[in-house]
Each structure stands twice: as C-alpha cells, then as structure tokens.
Amino acid sequence: MFSGGGGPLSPGGKSAARAASGFFVPAGPRGAGRGPPPCLRQNFYNPYLAPVGTQQKPTGPTQRHTYYSECDEFRFIAPRVLDEDAPPEKRAGVHDGHLKRAPKVYCGGDERDVLRVGSGGFWPRRSRLWGGVDHAPAGFNPTVTVFHVYDILENVEHAYGMRAAQFHARFMDAITPTGTVITLLGLTPEGHRVAVHVYGTRQYFYMNKEEVDRHLQCRAPRDLCERMAAALRESPGASFRGISADHFEAEVVERTDVYYYETRPALFYRVYVRSGRVLSYLCDNFCPAIKKYEGGVDATTRFILDNPGFVTFGWYRLKPGRNNTLAQPRVPMAFGTSSDVEFNCTADNLAIEGGMSDLPAYKLMCFDIECKAGGEDELAFPVAGHPEDLVIQISCLLYDLSTTALEHVLLFSLGSCDLPESHLTELAARGLPTPVVLEFDSEFEMLLAFMTLVKQYGPEFVTGYNIINFDWPFLLAKLTDIYKVPLDGYGRMNGRGVFRVWDIGQSHFQKRSKIKVNGMVNIDMYGIITDKIKLSSYKLNAVAEAVLKDKKKDLSYRDIPAYYAAGPAQRGVIGEYCIQDSLLVGQLFFKFLPHLELSAVARLAGINITRTIYDGQQIRVFTCLLRLADQKGFILPDTQGRFRGAGGEAPKRPAAAREDEERPEEEGEDEDEREEGGGEREPEGARETAGRHVGYQGARVLDPTSGFHVNPVVVFDFASLYPSIIQAHNLCFSTLSLRADAVAHLEAGKDYLEIEVGGRRLFFVKAHVRESLLSILLRDWLAMRKQIRSRIPQSSPEEAVLLDKQQAAIKVVCNSVYGFTGVQHGLLPCLHVAATVTTIGREMLLATREYVHARWAAFEQLLADFPEAADMRAPGPYSMRIIYGDTDSIFVLCRGLTAAGLTAVGDKMASHISRALFLPPIKLECEKTFTKLLLIAKKKYIGVIYGGKMLIKGVDLVRKNNCAFINRTSRALVDLLFYDDTVSGAAAALAERPAEEWLARPLPEGLQAFGAVLVDAHRRITDPERDIQDFVLTAELSRHPRAYTNKRLAHLTVYYKLMARRAQVPSIKDRIPYVIVAQTREVEETVARLAALRELDATAPGDEPAPPAALPCPAKRPRETPSHADPPGGASKPRKLLVSELAEDPAYAIAHGVALNTDYYFSHLLGVACVTFKALFGNNAKITESLLKRFIPEVWHPPDDVAARLRAAGFGAVGAGATAEETRRMLHRAFDTLA
C-alpha cells in the first residue's frame, strides 16, 4: 500500500492506518443527529508517517499572510485508543509521526479539506479573503460612511515596503521613511467588517529646552534631531543604523511640570518620533541626566487624546478632510486584515457619530477544551509541552452579541463522536441549534480547524471559564511548541499581528495571565465572577447553581480516559459535558454583560477594552489626567527622577501607621453605595501588596466600645469620602508645595491649607489660586454620573442597562483616583497627596466625635436643633455617644431615643454636622440605624437594622471556609441573640457586668435557649449517622503547593493525597474540600507515606508533579470509630498528629467509612462561637469558651476495643441529665455503685 507521497507504510504507519480504519467506519448516527444518514467515508488517504526528525515545515504562509491557507504535510499525533480493532495491549500511548496529505475534517459522513474554502462549509465564515483569493460575491462593493469601533491597533509601516501605486501621496509621506499607523477595527450597521487605517499619528515626548541646550550644545531644534539620530546609530546592535534626523521633528513649546505649585512655565522641546520602539530607546538611554516627559504614552493614546471627542469604543463617521481630501478604499489584494472593506485616511477624515448608541451585530465565541494525558498515567494532569498529552475536544458556541441569540454550536472532536440523543432532544426543546460535530484523525488537524474557524469567522469577543489561565495557554503552547504554527496571522491582522498569552505576575499569590489578540477581545467569565460575587467555590457548577439556578451533568476527570477509549458513543458523553460548559458560560456572560461596563470604562478612560481588562486602575486615571493636563498646559514626567527639582530632595516616606489606624478602603468601592461585607485589613505601613508599594498612613479608627448594644445605634457615612476630600481641599500634584517660602506671599487659611503629615509640613493652595487637576476630573465625572443616573428611570429597559453600566464605570474610575496617588511605583505617584487625604479623614472623625458629644450632650440641646425629636423619646436616661469610627463611618449609640425616630431624623442630623464642620462637597449621610448591635472589634460586628434585616461584617460566621454545620449552628445562635427578646435581654445583662463575675455565678436564665442550641450541636456531631457533607471545610489553593512557606496546611495534605491516588488534583485558585478525620493506625501510615511524597515533590522540576506514591486503602469500617486509638499490645504511644495531617478528601472518607474527628469539630465550633460572642464577656476569649462549655455535658468516647471490654464486664453507658442537678444525682449513684 502506498500513500500519495510514495513509499510503503512504516510500522508506525500501519498502526496509524489501523487507527484511522477504526475511526473511519462510523458506529452509528453522527453527532449532527439530524443531517443525512452517515456513510462510509470515501477517498480515505492512508497516513504516511515519517520519523519526527525528517519533517519539512508544512506548506503554509504566503508572502502577504502568515495563517495557514494550504498545507500538505504535518505532524500527526493521535491516541492509539482510536485503534478500536486493535488488541488492548496495542491501544496505549499515541501515534507520533508525519503525514503527507492535506488536513482533513469529517462531518455527517462527509469529508473535506480543513483549509478548503467553498460553499457548504462545515462552519460559518465571515472573511472575504482567504489565502490571497477574494471570495466576495460578484458586485460586492459596500458603501461605508458610519462604522462602530471596538478595537484599535497600531503598527509601523515603511514607505519602501509599500506599493506606492496603491496609496495616495499623503499616506506615503506619513510613512516616509517610516511611520505609525493606527487601525480602527469595527463593524458597519449592515454587519460588514471594516478596518480603517489612520496615517499621520505621531508619538512625542518633552525635554526641558534649557537643560538640553546646556548638555548638548543645541542652537536649534534640528541640532537636537541630529544628536538623537547619532545616538541611535551608535547604539548596540543593527536596529537603528539607518536612522537619520529625518525620523524626528522637534518644536519649542511652553509647558509646566505638573509637580508642585511653585513650578513655573518653561520652554520645552516637543520631539515627534515615528515609531514607539525608537521612542522607548530614547527615553531610556538618551542623555539620562535630562528628565523626559510623557515618553511612555503609546500611539493609540496619542490618537485618542490629540483628537478631541475621539473614543476607543463607539460610532465614527467618514468625512472629507482638509482640502476636501477623502478616505481611500484599499483594493482587496492590499488588505492587511480579514475585513470586508478597508480604508486609508488621516484623522481629519474622521468624526464621532453621536446620535447612535446601540451596538452592531458583533459576534461572541464561547469555547471550552477537554484534555487527556496520553502517557503511562492517563489520570495525570495534562501538560501542554508533552506531545502525548492531547486536546481531545473543543466546544465552540457562536452568539450574536446584539440579540444574544445562539447561532451555531460546534464540537471539534479528536476521533469519532456521537452526541447522546437525549442531549440533542434537550437542545431542540430549548430552541437551540443542533450541534455540528467535526471529527478529526489527529490533534493537529483539529487545532488547525479550530484556529481556521477563529480566523475565518473572526469573533470580535471571546469568552469562556478560566480560558486566560488554562484553555488559551494550553492551545497556544500546543500550536507553537509542538506543531510550530505561527500565530501572528490568526487575529484580525493577516500578518505581523499579536496572538499571545503571557504571565503578568501574581495577585494574592495567584499566577495571572494576560492575553492579547489583535481584533479579538477576550473576557474571561472566571475573573468576572470572582470579582462580582463571593462564593465558597468558584467551580463552574457551583457558580451556575448560585447565579443561574442551574447545574450541569458533571463528569469526573478520572472517567474521561475510559469514556474516550470506549468508542464514539461514550466520547459523545464527553462532548455533551464540553458543550454544556460553554452553554453555562454563555448564560453567565449575558447575565452580567461584562462587555458593556468594560466598554464604558474604556470610553471614559481613553484606552481600549483589552487594557481596561488587564492593565489595572492606574492607566485609567493616568490617561484622563494626561488629557486634562494637556488642556491646562501641564506635562507629566516619566517615572524615573520624578521628584528631582522643587526643593531638590526626594520626599521622605510618611511614617507607618499606628495601631489605631487602618488602611483605607480599596479603590473600586464607592462609599455612597457600598455593599456591606468584608473583613479586617492588615495595618498600613510601608509594604508591598500585589505589586503596590504603599507607604502612607492609613485612616484613623476610633476604637470600638465592644459589647451588645440593645439601644439604637445610628451609622453616619461620609459620601465618597476620599474623592470629596480631594475636591474640598483642592489636593493635587500641581497644588502641593513642600516649601514654606513658596507660599509666603499668600495668606494662610485663605489662600492655602497648611497641614502636618508624617512629621512634615505640607502646603496646598486653594482653588482660586490654582485649581486641582484631580478635583476637576472628579467634579466632571461625578456630574456626568449624576446626569446619566437621572436618565435611567425614563429609559427603555435596554438603554437603562447600558446607562447603568456607564454610571458604574464612572464610579469605578472615581474611586481609583485616591489609590492612583498612593502607589509608590505607580505611573504618577504622590504619596503626600494620599497621606494628606487620610490625615484629613482622621481629623474629620475626631471632629465629628467632639461635635456630637458637645452639641447633643443633653436632650434639650437635641430638641433645640430638631423639634421633631420630642416624638422620638423612649423610656430611660438619654445620652448620645460615639462608640466606633471606621474610616468613613461613625457609629452613634443613642439611649432614650426610638429607632424609628432616629431613622426619620437621621439625614437631618447628618446634614447639620456636615454644614457645621466640613467644606463641600464633603457630607455625612445617615446610612442605617441598628436596633441591636453586637460590636466585637474593628470591622467586626453583627447588627439588626431598623426594619429587621441583619447585617454581618467581618465575622467568622459567614466565612466560606467553614463547614455547613458550623455555619448553620453559628447562624442559629446569632438569630437567637437578635430575634429572641428573652435571649437578647439576658445577653445585654451579661455584657453589663465584668466577665470574671460570671465564673463564680450562674449565667442568666434567659440564655437557656442559647445553651440548647449548643447541646443539640454536640449531639449531632457525635451522631454516627451524621451527614459527612455537613462537615466539609474548604480552602483555596492560592499558588502551587511548592510555593507555600508553611506546608502544614490541611488543604495541601489533601492535594498530595489526591496526587498519590492519581486523582485529579485541583488547579490554582480552586477551593479544596476536606474533612478532619480521627487518628487511627491507617491514618498514621498514610501520613508517613505522604511525608515522603512531599519530599519528592519538593525536588521535582518546574510545575510538574512528582510521581505518585501508593497510599494504603483502609478496609471499610463504621464511622463511629473513635477520635483516638490506643496502641496495641502496650506499644509506645504514637505521636499525636497535627490537625493538618488529619485532613482527608471527603469523597474518599465517605467511600471508605473513615471516621470524623468529633473533638476537632466541636472545638472548632466553640472557637467560632467564642470569636463571635466574646464581646458579651469583655472580649475575653478564654472566659467565653469556659462559660460556653457549661452548656455541654462532659462525655467520654472510648475507643472500640475499650468499649467492648467495658460491655463485656457489664458496664453500660449513662447519659447526662436534663439539668446539672439531675446529672449530679446520677453521678452520685454511679460512684456509690462502684464503691
């Protein structure tokens, strides 16, 4: 038998032929389900496998594009389990060789070349050109005047590389000898994909003219251009050897450095550069002694900011430019993208189309991949760099973003695949498209088909679940490392584009990735979900249950190899699992509509959506500040040497925070619409936090008066505290001075604010002297937000959603301003501004406390300010006292007043304080009134708001790593405390006396119901029939296990046990479930073996897990096995294991009847209760635990062998009495009997 390439099949080829022959004979109806009946595939091309080292590179990229439009040889890797007629011993591992034929795809009994373009393709196609051939229908010539932009690209073109006959002279001039071209990607209202190439945009930077002339002896701008060109030509390497002074243009302008009030306008050289690469080199290396300004601003930002009104996401219109010049359509053969139409123009040919707000028919692709290890251990986690570890299926759902309609469902399968009829019926019943199942002989063919779909269909938006950290990196590593496929042509650009994933560091020890694809916006729903909602587990199934009230048919990773090897029908089960994952993610996408909020932020900040997703808060504020600074004649210095000048010294870092200070709320939290929740933050000091080095003082916290308060507590909040402080006090880089002589000519108090921060005197001039740039930004944004919110009630539902996302985007950016100034290594830090904000915040808290205590010390004074207070008097003495101050909140305990009355008059009280103490726009608002409040510590409290709603903040009661049993019991105790008036009264009496007193006296009778809950909890913990699922704890795997300093953690123990048992190990960021089990001989043996595995894993290279070591599998035994077992035969007593060593996988514990550690669980419950209720006992945790234990009878749980001996001797179990006296009588009788 011979292949088309000539020559007999090698032994490897015969195996591949067997694999293919089993694959090509369909076992039943194909997954498309409702198409024509399948038939035997015709014209099967037998694989010809050559040794790996002899492969010629696949025929691929032509001169004008770098995606594959033709291929006649490729590396063939396929699992041997597809050899369905082969004996079992021949079905292990993979075929790996080279095949000389075109890549094939099979669907519904039909066969096609993957790269062939023609009618009736297996997947939808939107690209006009393919492989340099125009496939547009006859007469296709769309007229484009209006188009929507969703992405902006930039690249450098060279005149000598272009066909001058195809370009107008003005475009050739813009790239002679080289020039930056901005490409706007978008869609027309009719759905045509458009690319508009904008010529003439230039990046630039500034240098002080006096310094340049002195250092370089320049007499004219041209001299500077010559000096820069010479420096570039002399640089290492050959990159800049052809640079001449014509690459630059310099002009003299007047500007002011944004730092410090005393800085005066000066002359600067503005140097225009034709490429970002040259700009970066000059700013980093040319005359380092001379400060550079705005050298890090990219060409896209310059394009947006230098053309007022331009946006990164919105509708544009083509119009005649200067001298009536028009945009030039490109001929198809000159297209640089996979668009339907392309234009060349300059910025003056563009205008914003303000009358349109709807989105065009953008396409959304939702995908998911399934992988399988192909080595000796099929249960190992697949590694992309291993050729034998394969992608076996890819589900791909295609939506219309404007209508949310699901238009296509595709399943790419390595090997034949028959989707279950039940799944097809379910999809049809839901009105969803029938899946098209695409089958492939090899992994390369499947991956090439998927990437060909990405190129030909070109979805503008892509989503999935954890695709940024897993799916995309795995696919791209496979394509580039194993198959050597260039990816730069698979985005919207046909070549020289970007399609890559890279690590961007760690956040809270989690490795994070970033993806950039030209013309494709990737929005990972995993990141959206973890940012928007708090759950105990972020697995897709848990998220679907919590958010969508839906769940999927789960398929264990351990089952995938067996299902895959079992044939087309069982592979269809994997396919159903893969498709339903994508369906759930699609539903989540349209539930949260993340593209609307992200695009609104992008518009406001002047950056594209990809930067909005991945580049953090800093760039958003920086770009807005850059725009405003240019309007006001300021320039922003680059980071290096920022604090030179203005006194000549770098500022001292403000002192670290004291114990009574805390870090301010993180950026992104809006003080006037804050959601309650969260825990304590670590004390502020100079430290590194997720890449942020902050060194300013935190906000002052007024120490809480701990206890159980049953009188009303009014909570006043400062609305948008930090933004309002910046506005009220005119704080900014440009209004700050570190020198007293700089403001000596001004009047203190009237013209400037003097304040001491961290032991240093700072001066900020008032707005009538120089208006703060930060204040202007905040004022404009807040006014815009107010206007948008006012439109929402009168809008249609669709428009209201869009407007709500816009106002939310403004809120996010507003709350980023304060944090922007406080990051020491940020884009434009000013720690003095950040420290001043928190200092003023502390002073405001103290001023409010003094005012309330003095102004309303007597009821008559309150009545004088608020006559309506006469109707809010309650029995008992009157007093008003602040019991807690928390960054931007003030808690006021009001005795002798009703909660209803305080709620009614609260806003008036807040306004009164605001007018008396603060400058506008700072204002207090009455946020809520607690009827009962358990105040535990800073940022830890539980209370019932007037109206009945309970609010819990910072308390273990709601921690997601507690088990369900402890959470339920804790919640029951809290409900009793707040909603049972008898218990509430007893608790209040308890809290009024010193805790030590209760050690010598009985607890109040009203706490009996409270104790009954604890007794019932103890009974349930010791019940042999308990449900283990109620006792499952979870902890997040925040980084690779080797990266943990403390290895003695419960969830790490379970991780290594799963590894040793060859089970699927969790991924980083997953929450690992575990239970704590009793210490037995089997557990001790497991711990010993696990220690060896940890040692082995610590020395394993890279991120690959160590080879598993077998763990003992205990015989099934009753769950009531005791917590501790006596050593047999009088042997030495074994070491008591750590709690972390007793952690076990819940599924394993259930399957093997492993006993729970009842002592641990009850101790843990008491620990949680002590943390919650210690405020009743003066915050003395030791006394709290001692008193709570009074409710629990002392019960000894003997080991099995001891219990058997006692029964044999005639002893019986005696339970506790209903009361302490009854128990005492029973014990007295027992001891008399024993005596």
Curated annotation (Swiss-Prot):
A cellular-component GO term for this protein: host cell nucleus
Keyword Nuclease: yes
Subunit structure, interactors included: Forms a complex with the ssDNA-binding protein UL29, the DNA polymerase processivity factor, and the alkaline exonuclease. Interacts with the putative helicase-primase complex subunit UL8; this interaction may coordinate leading and lagging strand DNA synthesis at the replication fork.
Cell compartments where the protein resides: Host nucleus
Ranges for region Disordered: 640-692, 1098-1134
Protein's UniProt keywords contain Metal-binding: no
Reaction(s) catalysed by this chain's protein: DNA(n) + a 2'-deoxyribonucleoside 5'-triphosphate = DNA(n+1) + diphosphate; Endonucleolytic cleavage to 5'-phosphomonoester
EC number: 2.7.7.7, 3.1.26.4
Family membership noted in the UniProt record: Belongs to the DNA polymerase type-B family.
Organism: Human herpesvirus 1 (strain Angelotti)
Biased composition (Acidic residues): 662-675
Name of the protein in question: DNA polymerase catalytic subunit
InterPro entries: DNA-dir_DNA_pol_B, DNA-dir_DNA_pol_B_CS, DNA-dir_DNA_pol_B_exonuc, DNA-dir_DNA_pol_B_multi_dom, DNA/RNA_pol_sf, DNA_pol_B_thumb, DNA_pol_palm_dom_sf, DNA_pol_type-B
Keywords: DNA replication, DNA-binding, DNA-directed DNA polymerase, Endonuclease, Host nucleus, Hydrolase, Multifunctional enzyme, Nuclease, Nucleotidyltransferase, Transferase, Viral DNA replication
